[in-house]
């Protein structure tokens, strides 16, 4: 298996949060574009069920799999993350922006080399497991750290039937053993069920786009509104159309 190319940590200017030897840190990485309640719910589930000391939200500069999606500036996403990550055990960080590559394997290799006495666990939602085989060197991620997958509405069956889940089926641990997952040598992963949040970054972006379009439509001069143009062209066709409401 191809290994991650690792530059010695001392040569990299990235500064992740402090972690003391012996601590167990959960890593939730992503573009957080934007962050939402489900991110916090996933983190708190992992904190409680795995007995983690902290969860780091690793806010990436961009997602290689979502190049066509508009990504808000990193500083803006960091600000939003801090406003949502109200749990004192959740730490928001953007150190990945200072790493040579944006891939998870490189991030994990850097952290493990920098803090060899800290136990790291990768956290992700079931929606990410469903498409995990699209990630760069995804198999390697499973061999580097234990992985916890937290259920997401409508994604359980797709996640558990995914290529990644099938490839590492023998490494799956019962949910009842979640408390010992961080101490289990990789590859090892478990699937957590529990309270769910329907929030998603995609849905939030789509809603914002729709709202923007509606605002733009209302801002059009009255003579540019489609129904007015239609009436001007054919009065008979719009005889039953009521007058436009005030403020339109």
Task: Indicate where each model-derived feature is located.
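Nucleotidyltransferase catalytic core that binds NTPs
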Residues: 1-248
């Amino acid at each position: 298996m191809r290994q991650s190319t690792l530059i010695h940590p001392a040569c990299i200017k990235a500064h992740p949060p402090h972690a003391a030897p012996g601590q167990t840190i959960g890593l939730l990485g992503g573009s957080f574009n934007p962050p939402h309640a489900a991110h916090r719910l996933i983190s708190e589930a992992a904190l409680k069920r795995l007995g983690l000391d902290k969860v780091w939200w690793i806010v990436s500069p961009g997602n290689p799999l979502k190049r066509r999606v508009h990504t808000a500036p990193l500083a803006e996403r960091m600000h939003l993350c801090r406003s949502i990550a109200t749990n004192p055990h959740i730490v928001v960080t953007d150190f990945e922006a200072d790493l040579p590559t944006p891939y998870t394997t490189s991030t994990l290799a850097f952290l493990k080399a920098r803090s060899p006495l800290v136990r790291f666990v990768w956290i992700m939602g079931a929606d990410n497991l469903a498409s995990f085989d699209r990630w760069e060197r995804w198999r390697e991620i499973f061999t580097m750290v234990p992985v916890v997958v937290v259920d997401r509405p409508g994604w359980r069956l797709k996640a558990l039937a995914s290529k990644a889940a099938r490839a590492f089926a023998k490494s799956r641990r019962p949910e009842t053993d979640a408390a010992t997952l961080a101490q289990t040598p990789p590859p090892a992963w478990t699937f957590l069920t529990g309270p769910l949040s329907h929030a998603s970054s995609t849905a939030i972006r789509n809603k914002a786009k729709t709202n923007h379009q509606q605002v733009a439509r209302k801002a059009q001069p009255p003579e540019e509104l489609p129904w007015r143009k239609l009436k001007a062209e054919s009065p008979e066709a719009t005889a039953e159309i009521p007058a436009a409401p005030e403020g339109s």
